[in-house]
Amino acid sequence: MEYLKQVHDFATKWVDKFRDQKTNYIELVDHYMADDCEALGFQMDCGHAFSEKYGNAASKYDELNQVIDEVTDISLLGSAIYSQWRYFNHWAYDAASILEFENRSWFILALSRLAVLSGENPFIFTGELEKIRIVSNRLGYGPCP
């Protein structure tokens, strides 16, 4: 359980940094993310394992957006995030391109999914229902089909 909390804290910390438009690209490509990924046991495999299962979603936002709900393996997703980050840190011609809309969106989507997988689902209602109102706009004339 402690590991899941660490992964959740990592995901929320970094998704906040990627969402913040004032974040300098140096803060995103510096070694701190690598340190966090390695501490959690994520592997830098250039995205090969993730690509085998999800194709171009390893680097393309539109592709990832289509399959993100199918991703349930925390270590696989974490390794994909680490590998994508490493691309910008080491191989990209311009590391500042990590700030481009599509690249930033890829990280936000992947890190958000990692946060959901490792933490409590914020969309599940917990508590006691006090009142409910159901409204239907379905009009029917005659017997139900």
Please name every model-derived segment.
Residues 91-144:
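Amphipathic alpha-helical binding modules
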Residues 19, 35, 41, 54-55, ...:
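Short, flexible coil/linker elements and helix-boundary hinge sites characteristic
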Residues 1-8, 21-26, 30, 57-64, ...:
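Short amphipathic alpha-helical segments that mediate assembly, nucleic-acid/protein binding
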Residues 4, 9, 19, 26, ...:
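Compositionally biased, intrinsically disordered low-complexity regions enriched in proline and serine
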Residues 1-51:
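Short terminal alpha-helical segments
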Residues 8, 16, 68, 72-75, ...:
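N-terminal non-cleavable signal-anchor helices
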Residues 56-112:
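Amphipathic protein-protein interaction modules
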Residues 14, 38, 44, 50, ...:
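Polar low-complexity intrinsically disordered regions enriched in Ser/Thr and small residues
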